[in-house]
């Protein structure tokens, strides 16, 4: 069992691609600096996070070159999906059934509002027609329409490298429904 604050820190570092210092981590996650320091020291010792010194501050980022880190991240991302509640869980179970996609991320208002107008989903695939057909069929059975954002893998990688706000927001706030390992690669 992974402690709650350790989970928070690993997920935060995974979702925020830039390097961050301990004060940013503790402020954004509402964890004491001492607790964050202790956790990060342990994660660094186990080679799950990398640190670098810039001036007087130490900056951290997730170590995705370590197989153990990737396994931890996959488990934590799967746990996030399992902990979905309400409408987001209902839609997630249906959307996960789509087979022609490497990566599926649920994002937007469905995750945090009871009053949502549509269900936003990112599909990483080379088969846009199948996605459109699937989403139209799902929209017919459910009360709210499923709005797909369809990208090819190369385009999504380019969006992230170019720090496009939409792609980064999806990574920061979205729930991975399928393809945790594809995301981590």
Positions of the model-derived regions?
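Short acidic amphipathic segments
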Residues: 101-107
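Catalytic core of pol beta-like nucleotidyltransferases
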Residues: 1-100, 111-116, 125-185
